[in-house]
């Protein structure tokens, strides 16, 4: 009788846990809606973005965009539920202001971490920092990346105030036409 009760209890627990699903990103991480990038938080500079980046609207080079040849590699972010990339966001030294955001329809499974702001967010506002002679090259890099519930091709939106573009990005999984990320 004891074994039957234990099996029944286990079956009920499994059934109930299957209904709960994976929590929304807001339930796991302290995510802000929109954060301004601090110009002083530049981590590096480069002569030009690598071929792994796609230049969007002339204001930002995005890693792993569908127009690049390979998706970004991810690593486990929290012991099992989320995967993260570690890739710089590259902007022109002295470039124009822009907004990079996660569309609302994917905010349950995608968010931005850091990229010049610290913490987690769904939108970053880059103010168009003044050109700094402190940086040797023409492009500045903000450290950070993207975090997804599971590897997939996800959308980001880039807006420069006059135009808005939806960009598909391979995060741990390729977008159509891309190679898978490196192992």
Question: Which role fits each region the language model picked out?
Answer:
Residues 16-18:
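C-terminal motif of bacterial Sec signal peptides marking the signal peptidase cleavage site
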Residues 1-8:
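Bacterial N-terminal signal peptides that target proteins for export
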Residues 20-183:
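Non-catalytic macromolecular-recognition regions in eukaryotic signaling proteins
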């Amino acid at each position: 009788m004891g074994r039957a009760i234990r099996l029944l209890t286990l079956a009920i627990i499994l059934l109930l846990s299957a209904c709960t699903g994976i929590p929304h990103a807001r339930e796991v991480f302290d995510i802000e809606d929109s954060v301004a990038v601090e110009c002083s938080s530049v981590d590096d500079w480069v002569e030009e973005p690598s071929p792994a980046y796609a230049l969007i609207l002339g204001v930002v080079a995005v890693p792993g965009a569908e127009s690049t040849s390979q998706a970004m590699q991810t690593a486990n972010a929290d012991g099992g539920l989320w995967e993260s990339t570690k890739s710089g966001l590259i902007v022109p030294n002295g470039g124009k202001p822009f907004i990079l955001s996660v569309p609302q329809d994917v905010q349950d499974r995608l968010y931005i971490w850091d990229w010049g702001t610290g913490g987690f967010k769904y939108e970053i506002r880059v103010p168009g920092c003044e050109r700094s002679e402190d940086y040797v090259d023409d492009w500045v890099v903000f450290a950070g990346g993207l975090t997804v519930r599971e590897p997939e091709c996800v959308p980001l939106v880039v807006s420069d105030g006059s135009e808005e573009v939806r960009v598909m990005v391979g995060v741990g999984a390729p977008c159509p036409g891309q190679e898978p990320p490196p192992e």
